[in-house]
């Protein structure tokens, strides 16, 4: 709960003899921090020391259709590697993507786990698995997070705590953390396909931009931590 939530609830309850509503915050920030602490320390590589890997996370068809052509063109002029995870991985989508990338001379491999992902040299790695994004964010340099061109952008807290600059579509404003990520320049929202590759250049070609966005992303999560403790303290008081 933030100050705006507090005001709304207070106005609703002002006739019910309730005069004090403490602000505890959002326990989800604590949860994502706790999950990140379980990550092996050796896997927590500084953003500028990571390989040039772009993670396309929770990709909806609307995201794919919006940016795929520009991504292929961009990859032909760079050396970055792409990890691609569909929102709902399935063999039909994997085959479509694999054929398309291969036709454009971009070597592609489909894997069912991330156990050996660091040993794969293919330009495109299509990951046919779920529940692996939290780990992958710690080894990627930039992430595109899907959903922003359809139902709403997916979880941004996991890439943020890993210090990964994010790019996502325009439907994000109902998520307060997403609004803060944009306002603090920890990530960028796009509405046109050309903006996608422009921001890839912005991050991959500038250590300063990458570092600033990475630090901003982590600070957003850390600055909102402590909600769980506040709730427990209030319940025990």
Where is each model-derived feature located?
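Nucleotide-activated sugar donor-binding and catalytic core shared by glycosyltransferases
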Residues: 1-237
